[in-house]
Amino acid sequence: NYFNQTYESLVTEYSNRESVKTFYQVWESPIITAGGKELMNDIIELCSGENIFKDIDQIAPKVSLEAVIIANPEVIIGSGAGLTKPEWLNYWEIWPSLKAVSEEHVYFIPPDLVQRQTPRTLIGTKQMCEHIDKARVD
């Protein structure tokens, strides 16, 4: 079926590429991310990204700003709660020492495409892979 074909196509295209340190941000205050038990972690891994918080054994852990800075992600991807890029995603611009910021790899994916597990998750997965791939190419 279409879902399985699309999934297999994404696996074939992205799953064996060089790893990219990835920070996925769900919310601003507190900073909420995806831990190792969240589907988002699996999506990041499918894209050959490395979730910088994969070792946290929670679905949606709160993390500190310092932890993100220390991990120094190569790409930052946020979702928020609406269809447009949340203003708080621009906050990272004040941290030019972060590789994702200095190389302009801060992206938005609408939450309906990645935070609600439906067939549309494949659309969000493709966007995730494309964003991670941009950081890989640089």
Predicted regions: what they are:
Residues 1-138:
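N-terminal ligand-binding lobe of clamshell/alpha-beta domains
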